[in-house]
Amino acid sequence: MAECDWDTVTVLRKKGSAAQSKSKQAVTAAQRKGEAVETSKKWAAGQNKQHVVTKNTAKLDRETEELSHQRVPLEVGKVIQQGRQNKGLTQKDLATKINEKPQIIAEYECGKAIPNNQVMGKIERAIGLKLRGKDIGLPLEACSKK
């Protein structure tokens, strides 16, 4: 009779599945019980985000100082605008030529965009002007054969 202990409790209940724990009902029930609930919002879920900023935004949020990401200089925006107009392209035409959204071209021209080397390279080739380095605004030389 040593195995007959009236103080031990056996719980015959399975743990809920992942789908159940993600539901709104399960989250509110857990909050009512006082359990720890961690929620996180999916960023850009269901959208086609091709060029995501690779800078560490969480690290930037933790910093106490006033820090912000470097933006495209206005000088580069003016060069893009002039090069585009010299080729007779609208923002929409340039965007379709480089497979980007017109909004991205507008952001680069206004100086609001965070520089992305892929996008900058596409724009450089489309308008034929350098946008990076020290020779900003000079014509892009043809690639020399190796």
UniProtKB/Swiss-Prot annotation:
UniProt xrefs under Pfam families: HTH_3, MBF1
Record's keyword annotation contains DNA-binding: yes
Positions of the DNA-binding region: 91-110
Keyword Transcription regulation: yes
Gene Ontology molecular-function annotations: DNA binding
Main localization, broad class: nucleus
Domain of life assignment: Eukaryota
Name the UniProt record assigns to this protein: Endothelial differentiation-related factor 1 homolog
Compositionally biased region (Low complexity): 17-31
Keywords, in A-Z order: Activator, DNA-binding, Nucleus, Transcription, Transcription regulation
Region ranges (Disordered): 13-53
Basic and acidic residues composition-biased segments: 32-41
Annotated ranges, domain HTH cro/C1-type: 80-134
